[in-house]
């Protein structure tokens, strides 16, 4: 069972509506997950029959059989008009940090738990996806964060995050000390288990669990949520998305720390380091079925009460 690694573009079949925005579609999913593999196989067959060129992310391509065009995420971003991520929000976040570098629309099929970012049902995606491919969809742009670690004035590490950048102890949970500055203005010193700097997208994730407010996706704002602060009056604070957040780690911290980006990428932090978190120039272009309602999603996922009358 070999994989066809030929990435040449076949001619579009006549069944494609040539006025559509999408011609080349990428499939991405969680490797070695039976439910995800089943959905990916159905998607690949369904899209191929309709004449779309389908590229499959190489980590899952070998599990889908033969006659698969396997490529990496960077090539999906560069070549595809639409990327379909099958999995949960974690899979979406991992793909989004790469795909945000490109002008590619991203839509999700939910094979996870809550699925705030994955709209399509795994067992009945065809009807909704067909409408999207025919041009009936809403587009939403979500901005990313850029996190940088400086040591003695030199950049040591950096990465991006869709949800949040979190300063926290490296291995064992314990109190750490640091100062927080907003646009170089001192805000406070903090003794806590860490600090979450979240986008509106991430406000329904780790930040929400830590007591932060939900920010609607269209807000140009960041929320800073201290983790178990030792001052009861310390509360989450919302700042402008154009703000630069600086956290200076006390030299007295005896343990090495980390900055986590979406819980996937970890940047090493030493006592005395400075962490800069700011809005990235990259944006994720999310595709939703027409009529997508954010408050309906919140109500459904969080179990909020339905209309009374």
Swiss-Prot record:
Q: Which gene encodes it?
A: nadK
Identify its protein family.
Belongs to the NAD kinase family.
Cofactor(s) for this protein? a divalent metal cation
Enzyme class (EC, first level): transferase
Write out the transmembrane intervals.
Answer: none
The organism's lineage is:
Bacteria, Pseudomonadati, Pseudomonadota, Gammaproteobacteria, Alteromonadales
Q: Cite a single Pfam family from the UniProt record.
A: NAD_kinase
The entry's protein name is NAD kinase
Protein purpose: Involved in the regulation of the intracellular balance of NAD and NADP, and is a key enzyme in the biosynthesis of NADP. Catalyzes specifically the phosphorylation on 2'-hydroxyl of the adenosine moiety of NAD to yield NADP.
